[in-house]
Amino acid sequence: MALGRLSSRTLAAMLLALFLGGPALASEIVGGRPARPHAWPFMASLQRRGGHFCGATLIARNFVMSAAHCVNGLNFRSVQVVLGAHDLRRQERTRQTFSVQRIFENGFDPSQLLNDIVIIQLNGSATINANVQVAQLPAQGQGVGDRTPCLAMGWGRLGTNRPSPSVLQELNVTVVTNMCRRRVNVCTLVPRRQAGICFGDSGGPLVCNNLVQGIDSFIRGGCGSGLYPDAFAPVAEFADWINSIIRSHNDHLLTHPKDREGRTN
């Protein structure tokens, strides 16, 4: 997320974190690879004035999920949600673009980057097809275990001083539960490599066993340092709240949460 798009309170927290070596907002992909076009049809781009600034995940036909710090302090009427994108520098016929009707948050604390999740209601309903689909979410409390292989993704920069790619990037990561507060964040590392998420467009999904288990939130110690884990908001801790928002606003999940054994609730 560009500094000019942050609220003064969030910006102050980020600068202090950088100075002290603490958490800083994420997340660009460092050390990843280009994703196959539309391999992740639930991936969304949050944009202002035609420019991408954060990722998001389609969780119902008229709702996306993202990081709270992405929209903290923003006039939501300036935000557009783009579905079905792959190459942001091309005019793609696969895209569906929506304005924001309403934003729901759940006690976001910008100073500690806690509860870094928002649900964004679109001004219309997405057309579900091969390029635009609803993500699978975990059931409440059914988080991801230690050493689970996952996939992070985003359109952010390839490094702190490198430009952003035009096409969606993906990165294999591994969950490390002993390096963060389990019910507060999902943390990941890339074993034996300097790779990970970085400053820029947060809000993108962490996919583990075909479920979106995390929302890109913050980093410590620099981009892809290999020393500190990257942190994601834990979707499983908010699953009941997410479902209540969707159900109370006259839409429904197209695919229902599943438990660890794959059973539909």
UniProtKB/Swiss-Prot annotation:
User: Quick check: keyword Protease in the entry?
Assistant: yes
Protein keywords: Disulfide bond, Glycoprotein, Hydrolase, Protease, Serine protease, Signal
PROSITE patterns reported for this sequence:
TRYPSIN_DOM (PS50240), TRYPSIN_HIS (PS00134), TRYPSIN_SER (PS00135)
Q: Which InterPro entries match?
A: Peptidase_S1_Elastase_sf, Peptidase_S1_PA, Peptidase_S1_PA_chymotrypsin, Peptidase_S1A, Trypsin_dom, TRYPSIN_HIS, TRYPSIN_SER
A single Gene Ontology molecular function, please? serine-type endopeptidase activity
Per the record, what phenotype accompanies loss of this gene's function?
Knockout mice are more easily killed by wild-type E.coli, but the knockout has no visible killing effect on E.coli deleted for outer membrane protein A (ompA). Reduced fibrin formation in response to FeCl(3)-induced vessel injury.
List all annotated glycosylation positions. N123, N172
UniProt keyword DNA damage, yes or no? no
Disulfide bonds, which pairs? Answer: C54-C70, C150-C208, C180-C187, C198-C223
Reactions mediated catalytically: Hydrolysis of proteins, including elastin. Preferential cleavage: Val-|-Xaa > Ala-|-Xaa
Broad enzyme group? hydrolase
**Biological process GO annotation list?**
acute inflammatory response to antigenic stimulus; biosynthetic process of antibacterial peptides active against Gram-negative bacteria; defense response to fungus; leukocyte migration; leukocyte migration involved in inflammatory response; negative regulation of chemokine production; negative regulation of interleukin-8 production; negative regulation of transcription by RNA polymerase II
Q: Where is the active site?
A: H69 (charge relay system), D116 (charge relay system), S202 (charge relay system)
What the entry lists under PANTHER family is as follows:
CHYMOTRYPSIN-LIKE ELASTASE FAMILY MEMBER (PTHR24257), NEUTROPHIL ELASTASE (PTHR24257:SF16)
| Known partners and oligomeric status | Interacts with NOTCH2NL.
Protein name per its UniProtKB record: Neutrophil elastase
Origin species, per record, is Mus musculus
- Write the lineage as a comma-separated list: Eukaryota, Metazoa, Chordata, Craniata, Vertebrata
